[in-house]
């Protein structure tokens, strides 16, 4: 079952400037991952808040890279495939974050994920 938005992955030109700006808005740093990922995860205070994973663009795409939904069952991927969703990755472990993700794009090219 898909239960909520888990995280929003954003790519930025200047990581520390983005972190500083979001800190002023009220988000708090909850984790930094080492290079080469070099991401900073931030959330608003309180329980069950969406995580913003801010990552350097390294000269590439800037903006929202994908939005991830929290899933409770690995079978969620199969259920969506039966409905016509084509996944680019399935049940891939991201070592730096400990998340297992399955990624797909919609007809407009926007990136989406399921994560545990």
Say what each PLM segment does.
Residues 21-25, 79-84:
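Short amphipathic alpha-helices in soluble, non-transmembrane regions
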Residues 2, 9-49:
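Core segments of cupin and vicinal oxygen chelate
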Residues 47-52, 108-112:
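Short, charged/polar, Gly/Pro-enriched secondary-structure boundary elements
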Residues 36, 46, 71, 106-108:
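Short loop/turn positions at the edges of beta-strands in beta-sheet-rich folds
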């Amino acid at each position: 079952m898909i239960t909520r938005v888990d995280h929003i992955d954003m790519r930025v030109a200047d990581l520390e400037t983005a972190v500083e700006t979001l800190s002023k808005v009220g988000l708090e740093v909850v984790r930094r991952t080492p290079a080469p990922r070099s991401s900073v995860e931030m959330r608003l205070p309180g329980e069950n808040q969406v995580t913003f994973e801010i990552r350097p663009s390294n000269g590439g795409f800037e903006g929202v890279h994908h939005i991830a939904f929290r899933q409770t069952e690995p079978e969620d991927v199969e259920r969506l495939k039966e409905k016509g969703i084509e996944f680019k990755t399935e049940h891939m472990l991201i070592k730096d974050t400990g998340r297992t993700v399955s990624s797909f794009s919609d007809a407009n090219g926007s990136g989406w994920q399921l994560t545990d």
